[in-house]
Amino acid sequence: GLGTWFTVERNAPDWVAITTAPGQMKDVYLPDSTLVALAGDSWIRYDAKRYDKERRAVEMNGKAFFQVTRNEARPFSVKTSQTEVTVLGTSFQIDEKPTVTEVNVVTGKVCFTAGEEKENVILTAGMSAQYSMENKEITVVTEEDVNKLAWRTGQLRFMETPLDKVIEDLSDYY
């Protein structure tokens, strides 16, 4: 009946979506003052009705850097097509590519969850992990990559770096 229609309509998400074109970068502040820096050809969305009231959850595709406002009562979560990152207050980057999703933690601590088995790993400042869609595994990355945030900082650094890595970093940046 009509009452059912209103119930469904009232509970339907009120999505707010922010997108960037290739080559464009955009800083977005969420309702709780969390900063999201979107890289080119990326998007995020959140439910305006529920964000910061029931939970702090966003969905994304592409590459984004998050500086999360601390709120222990409501953890912040980011979902990609295959993974989820949950935090209290920290700064980190998610880079979702067709075959792998990578998380780089700058400050604080995150829980990185992936796959149907909901495998998870805790990452702290300076740590990175990758989830491979092909082999369905999370791998903690031990070597630090100073150029992971180059798109955000505007700086690339190379010292005795193999040429293939220089080319990879340059193609990510440009």
Locations of the language-model features?
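A residue-level detector for the "anchor" residue at the start of short, highly conserved motifs
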Residues: 2-174
